[in-house]
Every structure is written in structure tokens, then in C-alpha cells.
Swiss-Prot record:
This is Protein SrnB. The lineage of its organism: Bacteria, Pseudomonadati, Pseudomonadota, Gammaproteobacteria, Enterobacterales. It comes from the Bacteria. Toxic component of a type I toxin-antitoxin (TA) system. Its normal function is believed to be effective plasmid stabilization through postsegregational killing of cells that have lost the F plasmid. Promotes degradation of stable RNA in E.coli. Belongs to the Hok/Gef family.
Length: 68
């Protein structure tokens, strides 16, 4: 039976940390891309967006000037 020493465990945790960071970055990129696409699709109709969930409120307001 082979036992892992502390060096093996720390290498495992370092690889796992890189793995989780990679997926967190991919998730953040997906959220940003979704928000960007949503705003491009609804840019003419979107002036204000409110999201209420529990104690959290997210409010987005677009401020722009009309072209002359």
C-alpha cells in the first residue's frame, strides 16, 4: 500500500486550484458574453432592468443621448 507524502498532496491541491480557477474564469467569461449579447439584442428597448432576489437588488440603467 502506497501512502502519499505532503509533497504529493500539495501538488494535487495546486493542480486542483488551477483547475478550479480555469473553470471560474470560463464561467465569468460566459456571464459577460451573455450580458453583452442581451444588451446588444435589446439595446433599443432596454432603458432599465431590475432584478430582485431575496435581499439582493440589481438595477441597471442605460443613459444615452439620441443621435441627431
Amino acid at each position: 500500500m502506497k501512502y502519499l507524502n505532503t509533497t504529493d498532496c500539495s501538488l494535487f491541491l495546486a493542480e486542483r486550484s488551477k483547475f478550479m480557477t480555469k473553470y471560474a474564469l470560463i464561467g465569468l467569461l460566459a456571464v459577460c458574453a451573455t450580458v453583452l449579447c442581451f444588451s446588444l439584442i435589446f439595446r433599443e428597448r432596454l432603458c432599465e432592468l431590475n432584478i430582485h432576489r431575496g435581499n439582493t437588488v440589481v438595477q441597471v440603467t442605460l443613459a444615452y443621448e439620441a443621435r441627431k
